[in-house]
Amino acid sequence: MTSDKRFAFTKIFVDDIEAQASFYRAAFEMREKNRLTIGTGRDAVEEIILTSGRGDDSSLIVWRYPERPTPAQGEAVVGFNVPNLEDTVRAVEAAGGTVHTKIEQMPELGFAVAFVKDPEGHLIEIVQNL
């Protein structure tokens, strides 16, 4: 039995929304799907919705509170499945991110994985199916 329910998005809080959106575009070839400003004053949020461009893909939403402090980093782990893990890790570093855990081959599980951090310290899990 299949379900029409699916994972839709992950939101991460950021300080510099433009720089963070640029990082995810450069490192993971994401595209901007939409940009929103919602609410006013302390209730205001700004968000940029990013996607890989596939019609069935989930979205990554980077958002910030213009009138409030940004919550502590590390509040979410973002996961990406990629065709070439080494190339993607290099793209992360070139875009200003850092390697948190080097590539680990897990052939018994059918994948390789690395953990990286974006320029503001958000943890990202990158998986390549073997």
Segments and roles (model prediction):
Residues 11-57:
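Core segments of cupin and vicinal oxygen chelate
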Residues 16-18, 73-123:
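Vicinal oxygen chelate
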Residues 60-63, 115, 125:
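Conserved beta-strand in the GNAT
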